Amino acid sequence: MSLEIARNDGVNPVVLKVVGEFLEEIGSRLDKGQGLWLAGGVGAGKTALAMLVSKTAIEAGHTVAIYSLPKLLARIRATYEKDLGGDSYTQFFDRLISVDLLHVDDLGVEKRSDWVLEQLYSVVNERYEMERSMVVTTNLEQQALEDQIGERTVSRLVEICGPPLTVDGEDLRYPRAPAY
């Protein structure tokens, strides 16, 4: 998705302006540890806009890690399986923290548990302390996200990303779905 396609799909012009400015200033924004938080309904274009940010960062020579939250949590769990020959928890965590931009999609879809809350807080807090950028997407409003992942974690996300940008509208996937 490009900003022009998003504009034609009816994405909120204010959101497009903020995202466009972020893209134009990608280097300085990442150097400052700034990010974006995109919230809204299913299929509204959040992931596409976040991918545009990640793609622009990569094209500008920055390091980026892109995960859906379920995949990120599964990857963290896999670090506990020492006999699989993968990264240790510390190695993987250090990579998550060291990339210029961490892109986490579908924040809030995870089943809430103490372990999940601990992992999310650890990643977000460490990136907050190291002034590292994040772009996150969620279907939840801020209060619902606080209820799901904790007020401390959301507070740090607001510090990194600013308040959520609401990407609203109809599910853009339906008009593109093939007719049978």
Residue ranges of each PLM-predicted region?
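A short, basic N-terminal segment
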Residues: 1-17, 164-165, 175-180
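Short glycine-rich substrate-engagement loop in P-loop NTPases that contacts/grips substrate
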Residues: 11-16, 58, 62-98
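Pre-Walker A (pre-P-loop) alpha-helix and adjacent loop at the N terminus of AAA/AAA+ ATPase modules
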Residues: 5-36
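Loop/turn-to-beta-strand initiation segments
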Residues: 62-63, 98-101, 128-136
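P-loop NTPase Walker A phosphate-binding motif
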Residues: 47-62
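Walker A/P-loop nucleotide-binding motif
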Residues: 32-50
